[in-house]
UniProtKB/Swiss-Prot annotation:
Keywords: Cell membrane, Membrane, NAD, Quinone, Translocase, Transmembrane, Transmembrane helix, Transport, Ubiquinone
Protein localization: Cell membrane
Family indicated by similarity: Belongs to the complex I subunit 2 family.
Gene it is expressed from: nuoN
Membrane topology according to the record: Multi-pass membrane protein
GO molecular function: NADH dehydrogenase (ubiquinone) activity; NADH:ubiquinone reductase (non-electrogenic) activity; quinone binding
One of the Pfam families matching this protein, by short name: Proton_antipo_M
Name of this chain's protein: NADH-quinone oxidoreductase subunit N
Main location: membrane
Superkingdom per UniProt: Bacteria
Organism expressing this protein natively: Hamiltonella defensa subsp. Acyrthosiphon pisum (strain 5AT)
Example of a GO cellular component annotation carried by this entry: plasma membrane
Amino acid sequence: MITSSQSALSGEMLMAMLPILIVAGTVVLLMLSIAWRRHHFFNGSLTVIGLNCALFSLYTVWGLFHFSQHDAINVTPLLRINGYSIFYSGLVILASLATCTFAYPWLQGYPDNREEFYLLLLISTLGALVLVSAQHLAAVFLGIELIALPLFGLLGYAYQQNRSLEASIKYFVLSAAASSFLLFGMAMLYAQTGGLSFTSLGNVFNEHVFSKPLILAGMGMILVGFGFKLSLVPFQLWTPDVYQGAPAPVTTFLGTVGKIALLAGVMRFFLYVPTFNVPGLNTALSFMAVASIFFGNLMALTQNNIKRLLGYSSIAHFGYLMIGLIALHQDPMVLERVAVYIVAYLFSSLGVLGVVSLMSSPYKGADAEALFSYRGLFWHRPILAAVMTIMLLSLAGIPMTLGFIAKFFLLLTAVNTHLWVLTATVVIGSAIALYYYLRITVSLFLSPPETLQRDTPKDWAFTAGGIVVWISALLVLVFGIYPQPLISFIKGFNALS
């Protein structure tokens, strides 16, 4: 915590908030630009420039810590900027940039107003940046709602299709219900403790809470809200429908930014609030993890829609990540291992959904989401098929990919903390997942259909979206073979947490 004068404190606060301020400023500029003149290229470029400036400003914030010799900066009681928040802010901004690159060609064929897409995306990104830096439940709620409200519009952006409208309405209704649970749980905690900051709640939870039913009920309500947002069983039923109905770039954003930001916020909350002091909470988390892994993987087996399949797959992946939450106070390396898994999941998801976006651009009605659309892709787009194969193998956790390193680290955490049921569940779930990931992979190399329904442009590898897919595949391979630079990079950030 900083002990300098008020003026210096204010200056450091503003510097620490630089990425958030830049994204917020870009939102204002974009609104003015849209009001002045609708120009897709200009407004899309403004969005990308703003996000790049926010990304590079993270280096300035990182340098601020070394210059000021502080481990963290508390920006009001709501936000805490440290290595942890800088790392996850970087992942959020990278995923938002990737979404912009996938969305631009898709919007080129869109028959209505295009610029609002970038505005909604920026507001949602702003919420994600607030969420990963939150140290107060009020900031958590603000961040979650800033992510969710623009997503209602993004999910229904292809409103000419009934499925897109259905996805938006389903997410709206269920998200509102989950937010109600979250808010009611926070109210219960406040009624019992008189505070909502993570520090004050942590002090309460370090005492015995058996005799405080409001705290137990409040934590249960909050767990329901978090479970919905992370699409964990039994709050997951919206996920496949929303993934399938949303436009491909929005599915990319929802599956990466939305979930990664929330997981970062939830993990920071549980860093202060030890789960082992709350009766039944670890048991509930373990049940949600096991059920999510089995449900997600088993339901994905029979899917013929790639976006729906990835929706079920994401349920399983965040079931795996629950190991990190359960073992948070039992393994000193758990933050680094979860971060490696998040990086692997991010780049693998960007790669697969990036290929779907490339195949679906420009807008021509329904996305190229049927598995049949990818049959024989190798025979007319061999490099794209190779890239997609790498990403699918990484999601499956096959050796020589980053996904294998990430899953190995999570298994190591489960073994070190004696979570034997979860260890067995991860092994069985991974074996099931191997089938449906290989099913997609094999179809890429089968004989192609006589007529191609959807295809990428011939110069896809030189487009912005193609470059993102290339880079993602390269990182997944390089860090899968030699992960030490990534691990050292992550440890450097966690040293300031």
